From Swiss-Prot:
SUPFAM superfamilies given in the database record: dsRNA-binding domain-like, RNase III domain-like
The keyword Repressor belongs to this UniProt entry's keyword annotation: no
A GO molecular-function descriptor: metal ion binding
Protein name in the entry: Ribonuclease 3
Domain DRBM: 157-228
E.C. numbers: 3.1.26.3
Transmembrane segment boundaries: none
Cystine pairings recorded for this chain: none
Recorded name of the encoding gene: rnc
Length: 231
């Protein structure tokens, strides 16, 4: 699939091919081909564009949410993990320009590269297309992902909730431990298993593709068990 064919699937007729090629160019490709520009500057702009439109979406759809809650939710949505999943969802990796070394190491599957290129492409659309086309792109990618996933659940801070309960009981023996980590080959990710311990006993267990995610899931498991034991 060519670059033009890929974007035509989203109703985007490219005007400036150079800016889109730049948005898809990794450092490794630029070094091998002596290309001057890479996606890094566009990534910078794309991050700001996404921040603005996601902020507007949250402001208009969560009219009673306080500023802190909106900020946390936005961070959950525009983080690397989420953006890389969106890039995978639309097969963006297939058109990224990588050097041979990155191709061999499957750079087209790496979350850091995928999320950066998604931001860079968003910037290219912002510069090359109308706002209507840009909004259509954002709706069909990042907002589509939001609709498929319970991001309200992602926004809930189980660790803070558990900490508040422990503090209310005047206890300070809450501890999180990394029990194990393993490489998930098909996803090219590290899955962590974290336990939460109270009074030296394991009360919750959780897994995730980051220590933070696994800790949140462990805290959620612990909260569920504490609530059941309180009945």
């Amino acid at each position: 699939m060519t670059m033009h064919e890929f974007f035509e699937n989203f109703g985007i007729k490219i005007n400036d091919s150079k800016i889109f090629s730049t948005a898809l160019t990794h450092n490794s490709y630029a070094n091998e081909t002596k290309t001057k520009e890479t996606y890094q500057r566009l990534e910078f702009l794309g991050d700001a564009v996404l921040q603005m439109y996601v902020s507007k979406f949250l402001y208009l759809n969560f009219t009673n949410a306080p500023e802190g809650k909106l900020t946390k939710t936005r961070s959950d949505i525009v983080r690397q993990e989420t953006l890389s999943e969106i890039a995978k969802m639309i097969d963006l990796g297939k058109i990224i320009r990588l050097g041979q070394g990155e191709i061999k190491s499957k750079g087209y599957e790496k979350p850091s590269i995928l999320s950066d290129v998604y931001e860079a492409v968003t910037a290219a659309i912002y510069l090359d297309q109308t706002e209507e086309v840009l909004i259509s792109w954002i709706k069909s990618t990042i907002f589509k992902y939001i609709e498929k996933n319970d991001y309200k659940e992602l926004n809930h801070d189980y660790k803070s909730e558990l900490q508040e309960i422990i503090q209310a009981e005047i206890r300070s023996d809450l501890e999180y431990r990394v029990e194990s980590q393993k490489h998930i080959e098909k996803d090219n990710k590290i899955e962590y298993t974290v336990s939460v311990n109270l009074d030296g006993k394991k009360y919750g267990i959780g897994t995730g593709f980051s220590k933070q995610e696994a800790s949140q899931n462990a805290a959620k498991d612990c909260l569920n068990k504490l609530k059941k034991s309180a009945k």
